[in-house]
């Protein structure tokens, strides 16, 4: 299957994926320590760099070297947190991935089933329309086998009111007499 099957259910809320912000919120709730400590490590790194910059401007090389070492420690803490969190939550991530794949498979199957139901309904409507159309054609053919009088009445009614000649009581009596003969 190269592309998904088209359906009118494409815009349905049930088949929508989560937004990146929702995904971030869900991941933050699942693994709260990794981003929190990682953010703390980033803040400590920025603070150490800022202090090193101020020490360099002031000409205090001892404080500057100390802050550069603190920056390295903060970056190490950040990296260690990310790696440890990745190892700790690896099994949960694989389980979550398997669950998402099963969910995606189920959604795809539901979408396909809904599409097939929709096609069946359209096919049924099409068959009903064809049957109705065939019945109308059959009725029209039967109506075509009637005597010429029906054609005359149809031609008479097709005339505009301004084009019709005056048809009075005497003319109606003459028509009745001529039809009987």
UniProtKB/Swiss-Prot annotation:
Cellular component GO terms held in the UniProt record: mitochondrial membrane; mitochondrion
Transmembrane segments: 33-50, 70-89
GO biological process assignments: mitochondrial respirasome assembly
Keyword terms: Membrane, Mitochondrion, Transmembrane, Transmembrane helix
Every HIG1 domain range: 5-100
Superkingdom classification of source: Eukaryota
Pfam families listed in its UniProt record: HIG_1_N (PF04588)
KW Membrane (keyword) present: yes
Membrane topology term: Multi-pass membrane protein
Location of the protein in the cell: Mitochondrion membrane
The keyword Mitochondrion appears for this protein: yes
Family: Belongs to the RCF1 family.
Known role: Cytochrome c oxidase subunit which plays a role in assembly of respiratory supercomplexes.
Subunit structure: Associates with the respiratory chain complex III/complex IV supercomplex.
The protein, known as: Respiratory supercomplex factor 1, mitochondrial
Lineage: Eukaryota, Fungi, Dikarya, Ascomycota, Pezizomycotina
Gene this protein is translated from: rcf1
């Amino acid at each position: 299957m190269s592309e998904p099957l088209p359906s009118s259910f494409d815009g349905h809320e049930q088949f929508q994926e989560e937004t990146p912000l929702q995904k971030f919120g869900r991941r933050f709730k699942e693994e709260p320590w990794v981003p929190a400590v990682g953010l703390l490590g980033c803040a400590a790194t920025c603070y150490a760099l800022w202090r090193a910059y101020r020490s360099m401007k002031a000409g205090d090389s001892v404080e500057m070297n100390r802050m550069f070492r603190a920056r390295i420690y903060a970056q190490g803490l950040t990296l260690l947190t990310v790696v440890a969190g990745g190892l700790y939550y690896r099994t949960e991530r694989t389980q979550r991935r398997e669950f998402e794949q099963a969910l995606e498979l189920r959604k795809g199957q539901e979408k396909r089933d809904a599409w097939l139901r929709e096609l069946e309904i359209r096919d049924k409507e099409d068959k009903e329309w064809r049957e109705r159309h065939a019945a109308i054609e059959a009725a029209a053919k039967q109506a075509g086998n009637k005597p010429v009088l029906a054609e005359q009445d149809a031609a008479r009614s097709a005339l505009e009111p301004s084009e019709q000649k005056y048809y009075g009581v005497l003319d109606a009596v003459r028509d009745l007499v001529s039809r009987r003969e």
